[in-house]
A protein has these predicted regions:
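Switch II (G3) loop of P-loop NTPases
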Residues: 97-117
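Conserved nucleotide-binding/hydrolysis micro-motifs of P-loop NTPases
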Residues: 109-110, 136-138, 178-181, 217-220
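Canonical P-loop GTPase G-domain recognition
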Residues: 180-248
Length: 256
């Protein structure tokens, strides 16, 4: 949970990555970091970026990017719980400021079960959540209410837990692999209709949530392949804004 060693130190938030095996959690995190490492988030003379001083994490990311560049394939599913520690920093007219630090837990999909005591403890000890659902799966199951309900089961369990414990922790729901949808065949409309039952459920419980659409395709380059990102880090920035009770880009010289 959020903590700080002194009043003036930036808070440290714990975020939990939730989703079934192969849904695209690790690719999302890599895509988010690519954007914020390359300073793509700029507005009104302000600039945001992630900073990571852990050499092991840097080596992990570099290894994944090399694999993508050489093979044109996504990384294999995560086999063990991985912690990623980052600092979110801002540069503006007043100089550089550390907004906050966060640790993102990225457990393997098979351990993301609400009846798993270790996973349950991670849920209760987290400050915010990124829940991942395969957009193509929603479209494929749109005409099968029972199968569609199973797709949302984990997210609904988390929402139930938040509601029963009277918690307003933010929940970012990331619909992955949207670049694979066939919009010429109305997959977009089918997707919107498919997520309606989940939205109705979350709103009934008054969960603090937002839905995001993620597209991180692999594209060919002169040097091989790379991940193509566009606003991939928006869900994490939204979580940071909610946890800090401020718009990330509405900050002036006085940073909370």
């Amino acid at each position: 949970m959020a903590n700080s060693s002194t009043k003036n130190d930036p808070k440290i938030y714990s975020l939990l990555s939730i989703g079934q095996r192969g849904v695209g959690k690790t690719v999302f995190l890599i895509g988010s970091c690519i954007e914020l490492y390359t300073n793509q988030y700029q507005e009104n003379g302000q600039q945001l970026w992630f900073d990571c001083e852990d050499p092991e994490i840097q080596q992990t990311f570099e290894g994944i990017l090399r694999q993508v560049a050489q093979t044109g394939q996504y990384p294999s599913a995560t086999m063990k719980i991985t912690n990623f520690d980052f600092t979110l920093k801002l540069r503006n007219l007043w100089g550089n400021k550390t907004l906050c630090q966060f640790r993102l837990w990225d457990p393997p999909g098979e351990s993301c079960q609400i009846y798993n005591p270790a996973f349950l403890m991670m849920v209760l000890n987290s400050d915010g959540y990124c829940a991942f659902i395969d957009a193509c799966t929603i479209v494929e199951r749109a005409n099968d209410p029972k199968a569609l309900a199973q797709t949302f089961e984990l997210v609904k369990s988390i929402a139930d837990m938040l509601h029963s414990n009277n918690l307003q922790h933010p929940l970012a729901i990331v619909l992955t692999k949207c670049d694979r949808l066939r919009f010429d065949l109305q997959d977009g409309q089918i997707l919107e209709q498919g997520i309606q039952p989940l939205q109705t459920f979350l709103e009934k419980l008054e969960v603090n949530y937002q839905i995001f659409y993620s597209s991180i395709p692999i594209v060919a380059t002169d040097d091989g392949f790379c991940l193509k990102t566009s606003e991939a880090a928006t869900p994490i920035l939204w979580l940071m804004s909610k946890l800090r009770n401020t718009d990330i880009f509405s900050l002036n010289g006085d940073i909370m």
